[in-house]
Amino acid sequence: MIYGYTEKELEKTDPDGWRLIVEDTGRQRWKYLKTEEERRERPQTYMEKYFLGKNMDLPEQPAAKTPIESARKGFSFYKHLQTSDGNWACEYGGVMFLLPGLIIAMYISKIEFPDEMRIEVIRYLVNHANPEDGGWGIHIEGKSTVFGTALNYVVLRILGLGPDHPVTMKARIRLNELGGAIGCPQWGKFWLAVLNCYGWEGINPILPEFWMLPEWLPIHPSRWWVHTRAVYLPMGYIYGEKFTAPVDPLIESLREELYTQPYSSINFSKHRNTTSPVDVYVPHTRFLRVINSILTFYHTIFRFSWIKDMASKYAYKLIEYENKNTDFLCIGPVNFSIHILAVYWKEGPDSYAFKSHKERMADFLWISKKGMMMNGTNGVQLWDTSFAVQALVESGLAEDPEFKDHMIKALDFLDKCQIQKNCDDQQKCYRHRRKGAWPFSTRQQGYTVSDCTAEALKAVLLLQNLKSFPKRVSYDRLKDSVDVILSLQNKDGGFASYELIRGPSWLEFINPAEVFGDIMIEHSYPECTTAAVTALCYFRSLCSHYRGPEINKSVKNAIQFIKESQRPDGSWYESWAICFTYATMFALESLSCVKDFYENSFHSRRACDFLVNKQEEDGGWSEGYQSCTDGIWTRHPTGSQVVQTAWACIGLMYANYPDETPIKRGINLIMSRQQPNGEWKQEAIEGVFNKNCMISYPNYKFNFTIKALGMYSKRYGNI
């Protein structure tokens, strides 16, 4: 029951009409077929039925009696979720501030909302509203915030829900309790300002002039973390020009609905630093407040038109580079939505750039049984496919006649997904080399990612080392991948996400976003470092003559980073999934590559003791997302999670933990949660980024459970 509505009473589309259109490059878009004739010509696949929450009509199987039977049964189900081009698709959702950017951009640029999109976005937001107070958080499991509530309220109003609808009324009450939209963090203020529901003078300056500073300055945006600079580039361009939507009746109404006082009475300039306490994750530092005061003075007094024009022109040139080098996908959905507005206001609705962005919107939208969301990228195609391959090879099932064709298709996808060309004007657009890299999603998105490159390289090597598999990726291309990985090692020995660390650590003191942590520069991560170590070690075992001394040095330095970043309790903190369990699994895998195991390694022993001490009474492991936000291990309130349990078991097995008992208990829990058709049900959210925002990785419940079961079977045999 949601605000007096049951799920059946919410307006919804017919789930029989949805189809996932997949291209051989990994591109995926949902399309709604309206006629019975269209639907008969293209019946729904098992995969589509699964994503829509429909009955797949797969036969039930007897409960698995051994871990390898469970792994086989799991992949017998999971193979049905593989797309026609060989990758594993899924939602990449859970983030509640992405849809508002797209919907606001569409509204301002007059892009029509298809009925099926309007209906399903409303349904998604209603389904994910806080059941107690009616608001929305920064992610689906988070508490209600001004950021989430104000922006998603705007979305519902744009899409047709009136201010007196039970859903909007309850959300507005919660927003008022939180102090109204005046307490939005900076990104929320930006979206309200472009919609003409907030004054530009109430936002701390976001100036495109930063891009014109000398590049040797530590504060130059090219030294920022890639996602941060990608967002603040178009944001700064629009702020610099003060583009805003013309006032219409809806905007006039929203102006009064979003605030606790009349809109005309608000002095926005006094609220540049007003952020609701419930939203603040990283408060403004004194250093940032001083910089903002200086920038405000400059912007108000000394920003001459010729400077503004020069800065805007340069910023827009960089926007064009981003569009070109990502085939109009952009690095992610936040800057994608801002780019829609930038090209609309600069080039107009009939321009090639605007039409290209419009055509790309479907790449980010995902339909589920709860409605339509906006994914955190254009998918997780490469990332999840790499782990699926590794799980099957680790389990000894890759050459199984039932599964081999699926692995060949996966290898074909990995082959097509590798980036084989550097960006044009690479230095001018501040991009790292990408020839030989693999991305997170698709080749067209085009960004080098360290762990994606490493995990994909490992997956390719594992398959191509099996005699019965074709050699799709040439030796020269494998060497290109190794070159990319080696180019990404930081001075501390660790590996970051997209690039080398370019800026000084003190840049984190000028983080303006308020809701995210560690976003100003790259940081070295245990997960990315482990991916690099394992890939390099496996490559070295097969091709020891290529850059051998450099690989040896790289691995040595990376392992030293892993050891030095271990916490006193034996764990590691990770920034891309939840959290200490995930990081500790990867760190133990790294240590195993250099034969550091429980019996001979102090670091491995401490890590194993940490994991074993966190085991639940039922044999599983349980860790909540607050571990990420608070930096302290926190138990998940619902108890053991199959994904967390798989991670812990995998880590202990990599470490050759001498007592089989805790591992066996974990494996038993994984097997007990398996459904008669072979699947595992979705449990708590798995991923995180920027410390404070959670994101879904639903394929982890297949990739890591199958891997854990297969590893156990190889090491211990049957239970």
Swiss-Prot record:
GO MF: lanosterol synthase activity
Give any single GO term for biological process.
Answer: ergosterol biosynthetic process
Q: Which SUPFAM superfamilies match?
A: Terpenoid cyclases/Protein prenyltransferases (SSF48239)
Q: Which PROSITE patterns has this protein been placed in?
A: TERPENE_SYNTHASES
Q: Which Gene3D superfamilies match?
A: 1.50.10.20, 6.20.120.20
Pathway assigned to this chain's UniProt record: Terpene metabolism; lanosterol biosynthesis; lanosterol from farnesyl diphosphate: step 3/3
Enzyme Commission no: 5.4.99.7
Purpose of the protein: Catalyzes the cyclization of (S)-2,3 oxidosqualene to lanosterol, a reaction that forms the sterol nucleus.
- What NCBIfam families does this protein map onto? squalene_cyclas
Q: Which family does it belong to?
A: Belongs to the terpene cyclase/mutase family.
> What is this protein identified as?
Lanosterol synthase
Instruction: Specify the species.
Output: Pneumocystis carinii
Give the gene that encodes this protein: ERG7
